[in-house]
Amino acid sequence: MSLMKNERAIIMSMWEKMAAQAEPIGTETLERLFCSYPQTKTYFPHFDLHHGSQQLRAHGFKIMTAVGDAVKSIDNLSSALTKLSELHAYILRVDPVNFKLLSHCLLVTMAARFPADFTPEVHEAWDKFMSILSSILTEKYR
């Protein structure tokens, strides 16, 4: 699966709107993940998982920074995500299904925060983009 030129443009345009709110978007995405899929909390036993905690905000920002880096490397995603894939596969040993769960929570957060901008075309492009990211992040599991 690859992104078409118009999908890349949609993703980059939406990212420009999101980048300034990276920390709150990332935090809200994690809070949605932990609320909707409580089993994902097991990967964060050392975190304060209360609403708006410093650790949630920091990790949310880290996730969104990685998403932003992926947007910047949209034409070479595999190379851009190699270290992140290795970290999650070999060191953190995150169940690959969690990438899809996080992706879904990010899409819901985007829709809630940008209702006028989150058109069906934006939804489709970002869903495809996050599916590609999830797939790349699970490559090292094979």
Curated annotation (Swiss-Prot):
The keyword Glycoprotein does not apply. Residues 2-142 form the Globin domain. PROSITE patterns: GLOBIN. InterPro entries: Globin (IPR000971), Globin-like_sf (IPR009050), Globin/Proto (IPR012292), Hemoglobin_a-typ (IPR002338), Hemoglobin_oxygen_transport (IPR050056), Hemoglobin_zeta (IPR002340). Keywords: Acetylation, Heme, Iron, Metal-binding, Oxygen transport, Phosphoprotein, Transport. The modification N-acetylserine is found at S2. The modification Phosphoserine is found at S53, S73. The modification Phosphothreonine is found at T29. GO terms for biological process: carbon dioxide transport; erythrocyte maturation; negative regulation of transcription by RNA polymerase II; oxygen transport. Heterotetramer of two zeta chains and beta-type chains. This is Hemoglobin subunit zeta. The lineage of its organism: Eukaryota, Metazoa, Chordata, Craniata, Vertebrata.
